[in-house]
Design a protein with these regions (language model features):
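A short glycine-rich, Lys/Arg-flanked "PGG" loop and its adjoining helix->strand segment in the class I
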Residues: 183-197
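Class I S-adenosyl-L-methionine
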Residues: 212-278
């Protein structure tokens, strides 16, 4: 199965500027949808807040040209065939929340034998990662738009993933917002059901109270085991590059904690049925 190639489009000199968008018209007709899942699934507390941000001309161009080839709207309507999505049967790592995509692109370039399915709702970041993938020839990156929970629950098969990365999720620091944090027992159970035995769950955060919550929750969960013999946090592995956001935090004296847990074999997870995350 061949890997799809991105189309290229060049504007000629003197080409007229795009017309103004009519009221109600999609922002990017061939790009990501504003709410791909719509109201087809139950309302629940979300760990993210979609926000409108300025999209540069380069990002808009990438969204229009490359989304039909390398983009995916999370609508929950079907079970994904990951080999078809990537054009090969290499291992797939899911990354939830990639910001502007620089670290994602760097990891994809360093490990061409692993496919990365990167999920975010931030339109400028989606466009920038698509641009980086084309610029650097990264055929192992696909960009997904929407709710990662719906993707995991409705669109991925049990044991489909060889890894899961959650780098610097929103810490929701106010106590009344802690319920919005992504790393919760219910999420970990869902994630465990979609990770193959031995797959790595890698989290990183610079918010220490959230790091402690992550460590406590992962340690208590029967689907995961800490790769650290001391049961604590891990040093940043060399394969995880420093992000722009992380550098800013380090400059302010923030402490960054990495957590690396492996998905334990099925037989070690008493009472769990594959495909039944809850």
């Amino acid at each position: 199965m061949s890997t799809p190639e991105a189309p290229h489009a060049e504007r000629t000199a003197g080409e007229p500027a795009p017309r103004a968008r009519a009221k109600g018209e999609p922002r990017f007709p061939d790009g990501p949808k504003a709410d791909p899942a719509g109201s087809h699934f139950e309302r629940r507390i979300r760990s993210f807040q979609p926000r409108r941000s300025r999209v540069t001309a380069g990002q808009a161009d990438a969204l229009q040209r490359l989304w039909p080839v390398w983009g995916l709207d999370i609508d929950g309507s079907r079970r994904l065939d990951l080999a078809e999505l990537f054009g090969n049967d290499r291992p797939v790592v899911l990354e939830i929340g990639f910001g502007m995509g620089e670290a994602t692109a760097e990891m994809a370039a360093a490990d061409a034998g692993t496919n990365i399915l990167a999920v975010d709702v931030h339109t400028p970041g989606q466009g920038h990662l698509l641009h980086l993938a084309e610029e650097r020839g990264l055929a192992n990156v696909r960009v997904a738009n929407g709710d990662a929970i719906i993707l995991l629950r409705e669109m991925l098969a049990p044991d489909a993933l060889s890894g899961l990365r959650v780098f610097f999720p929103d810490p929701w620091p106010k106590k009344r917002h802690h319920k919005r944090r992504l790393i919760q027992p219910e999420f970990l159970t869902l994630a465990a059901s979609r990770l193959a035995p031995g797959a790595l769950l890698h989290c990183a955060t610079d918010w220490e109270p959230y790091a402690e919550q992550m460590l406590e929750g992962l340690t208590a969960h029967p689907g995961f085991e800490n790769t650290r013999e001391d049961g604590g946090f891990a040093p940043r592995p060399e394969f995880r590059p420093l992000t722009r956001f992380e550098r800013q935090g380090l400059d302010k004296g923030h402490v960054v904690n990495d957590l690396l847990f492996r998905r334990v074999p099925h037989d070690d997870r008493a009472g769990h049925r594959d495909g039944d995350p809850a």
